[in-house]
């Protein structure tokens, strides 16, 4: 996604949960350089409010929440695009660098992207970390 593709900010009065659900559905979390400040602007609230909301409602800090969204998307992509390398999948979800992607993927799932692909490519359900 390039900078010109950034969606217009949502109306300030819109419910933050609805705004975040729409942002997640649009896969806004895959954009490189995503920050708490940029997301707050997109959903029409201030940085502090968004941070408190994510911490209290989702039980994660902002960086861990974005990481979880990106890894969940990478799990889907690994299975849907068997010809894509792990590096390509990492870049598709906004995680740049092979070692960074492998480290984050392994931390969240407990296995490497290749192990995940081998284990679940046969149509088994998504890994337990996503249930």
Give the positions of each predicted feature:
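Short, Lys/Arg-enriched, Trp-marked, Pro/Gly-tolerant hinge/linker segments that flank
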Residues: 1-18, 29, 56, 60-61
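Terminal helix-turn-helix DNA-binding modules in bacterial transcription factors
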Residues: 56-93, 119-131
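Sequence-specific DNA-binding recognition helix
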Residues: 81-117
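Central "turn" residue of the DNA-binding helix-turn-helix
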Residues: 41-44, 94-96
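…primarily DNA-binding HTH/wHTH and HhH modules…
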Residues: 3, 7, 103-131
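Basic, amphipathic alpha-helical hairpins
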Residues: 20-34, 54, 58, 75-84, ...
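HTH DNA-binding helix-turn interface
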Residues: 51-65, 105-113
